[in-house]
């Protein structure tokens, strides 16, 4: 009976987080074994999320910013980054396919990520910390007064929330929210931080102003890069190696439809990204033109710098002639009607079109990665103005060692006589 009473006491402790008798703070979600042994790991957990409308490729950029913050934290304490599960993205519109709570291992190689910073999947966090509790949620926002012209100042302050919170308290005064589709997850405290500056600006606050073991930064896109384009940036970007099964699908497609293999294309790919240090221009690329043609909602806000289908095809044919290529691979989000029109104008185009079973397996994010992988290996690539999808292909080609002249190219709008081409961000080792 005494044992049963002790179990109930432990359950009560898990439900309500008072300070322990020893004076140490009790962490919600701690397991009974942790309490009994007192040997729970003291490493702290950093979680984050991004504004819901933001797409897959911008979220990959936010990961790089958060990785910089984690590296700063690791100089003082033991932290680990909890990877935010993928799901509910606007551009993932394939019907009847479950696309929520997707772990990062579906899209990226976790051992590669871990060579750069310590990372774990969200479900491992739940298992390690003893339950689906996040001690402190900080919602990042701009300053209400805005930025006044003059000297740029990096700063962070706890401020009243400007917008209505997307979190609500339950009867236990825990906070419910989206939490990547994990309905059982609760936040214990939610407050707002006004931020202006690079990601590491919040490090002192996380180290000194809160003792929370698990901290989530919501709206993390409000943080800027610590050193965009520097060695640290490229180390993190290089560590974001695509999952092997997606690379293999892309490689098989290249071989079968585009007469392209790493050996023939002089692509020096290695599984260990830390061993890949390639001289730019040393890679040749496959005997095809790679094209990323953004359509759908994108053209509404970019009517001046995105071509019509006819204008795009004229440019494609010109490039194929110039570079003596008779194959063209097209990655596009065009709706069925536009795609059929494009196919009529460019009957020789090749596209990766998964079966329903393949789509269910790889999901929209996996298909996007396969498209990018194939475009990254092309002899010459042309993308869409200010598209993060095209930006990620630029980076992938830079990592593979292709000539920048064959990488940093974009379509001009029909009315643009000459348009500014993308900036070359040179890889740094």
Swiss-Prot record:
Isoform A is expressed in fetal liver and peripheral blood lymphocytes. Isoform B is expressed in spleen, lung, testis, bone marrow, thymus, pancreas, prostate, fetal brain, fetal liver and fetal kidney. Isoform C is expressed in brain, heart, spleen, liver, lung, stomach, testis, placenta, skin, thymus, pancreas, mammary gland, prostate, fetal brain, fetal liver and fetal heart. Pfam families: O-FucT. The active site is at 54 (proton acceptor). InterPro entries: GDP-Fuc_O-FucTrfase (IPR019378), OFUT2-like (IPR045130). The record marks 396 as: Essential for catalytic activity. One of its GO terms (molecular function) is peptide-O-fucosyltransferase activity. The gene is POFUT2. PANTHER family: GDP-FUCOSE PROTEIN O-FUCOSYLTRANSFERASE 2. Its EC number is 2.4.1.221. Inhibited by EDTA and by Zn(2+). Disulfide bonds join 161-192, 412-419. GDP-beta-L-fucose binds at residues 53-57, 292-294, 371, 388-389. The lineage of its organism: Eukaryota, Metazoa, Chordata, Craniata, Vertebrata. It comes from the Eukaryota. Pathway: Protein modification; protein glycosylation. Catalyzes the reaction that attaches fucose through an O-glycosidic linkage to a conserved serine or threonine residue in the consensus sequence C1-X-X-S/T-C2 of thrombospondin type I repeats (TSRs) where C1 and C2 are the first and second cysteines of the repeat, respectively. O-fucosylates members of several protein families including the ADAMTS, the thrombospondin (TSP) and spondin families. Required for the proper secretion of ADAMTS family members such as ADAMTSL1 and ADAMTS13. Keywords: Carbohydrate metabolism, Disulfide bond, Endoplasmic reticulum, Fucose metabolism, Glycoprotein, Glycosyltransferase, Golgi apparatus, Signal, Transferase. Glycans are attached at residues 189, 209, 259. Changing residue 395 to A: No enhanced secretion of ADASMTS13. It catalyses: L-seryl-[protein] + GDP-beta-L-fucose = 3-O-(alpha-L-fucosyl)-L-seryl-[protein] + GDP + H(+); L-threonyl-[protein] + GDP-beta-L-fucose = 3-O-(alpha-L-fucosyl)-L-threonyl-[protein] + GDP + H(+). It is found in: Endoplasmic reticulum; Golgi apparatus. This is GDP-fucose protein O-fucosyltransferase 2. Changing residue 294 to A: Abolishes enzyme activity.
């Amino acid at each position: 009976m005494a044992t049963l009473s002790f179990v109930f006491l432990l359950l009560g402790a898990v439900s309500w987080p008072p300070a322990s008798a020893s004076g140490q703070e009790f962490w919600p979600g701690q397991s009974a074994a942790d309490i009994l042994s007192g040997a729970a790991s003291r490493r702290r957990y950093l979680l984050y999320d991004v504004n819901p409308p933001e797409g897959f490729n911008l979220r990959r950029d936010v990961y790089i910013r958060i990785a910089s913050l984690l590296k700063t934290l690791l100089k003082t304490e033991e932290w680990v980054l909890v990877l935010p599960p993928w799901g509910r993205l606007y551009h993932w519109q394939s019907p009847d396919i479950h696309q929520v709570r997707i772990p990062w291992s579906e899209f990226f190689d976790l051992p590669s990520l871990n060579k750069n910073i310590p990372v774990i999947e969200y479900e491992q966090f739940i298992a390690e910390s003893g339950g689906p509790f996040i001690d402190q949620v900080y919602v990042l926002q701009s300053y209400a007064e805005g930025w006044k012209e003059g000297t740029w100042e990096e700063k962070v302050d706890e401020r009243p929330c400007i917008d209505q919170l997307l979190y609500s308290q339950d009867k236990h005064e825990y906070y419910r929210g989206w939490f990547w589709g994990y309905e059982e997850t609760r936040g214990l405290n939610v407050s707002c931080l006004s931020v202006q500056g690079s990601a590491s600006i919040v490090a002192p606050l996380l180290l000194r102003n809160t003792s929370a073991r698990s901290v989530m930064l919501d709206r993390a896109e409000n943080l800027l890069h610590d050193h965009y384009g520097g060695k640290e940036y490229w180390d993190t970007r290089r560590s974001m190696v695509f999952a092997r099964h997606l690379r293999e699908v892309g490689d098989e497609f290249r071989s079968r439809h585009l007469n392209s293999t790493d050996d023939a294309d002089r692509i020096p790919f290695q599984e260990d990204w830390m061993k890949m240090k390639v001289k730019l221009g040393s890679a040749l690329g496959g005997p095809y033109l790679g094209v990323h043609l953004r359509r759908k909602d994108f053209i509404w806000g970019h009517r001046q710098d995105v071509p019509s289908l006819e204008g795009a095809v004229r440019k494609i044919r010109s490039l194929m002639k110039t570079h003596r290529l008779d194959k063209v691979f097209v990655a596009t989000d065009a709706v069925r009607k536009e795609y059929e029109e494009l196919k009529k104008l460019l009957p020789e185009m090749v596209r990766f079109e998964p079966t329903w079973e393949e789509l269910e397996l790889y999901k929209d994010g996996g298909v996007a990665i396969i498209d990018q992988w194939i475009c990254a290996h092309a002899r010459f690539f042309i993308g869409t103005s200010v598209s993060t999808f095209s930006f990620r292909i630029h980076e992938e080609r830079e990592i593979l060692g292709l000539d920048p002249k064959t990488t940093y190219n974009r379509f001009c709008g029909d009315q643009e006589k000459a348009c500014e081409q993308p900036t070359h961000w040179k890889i740094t080792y």
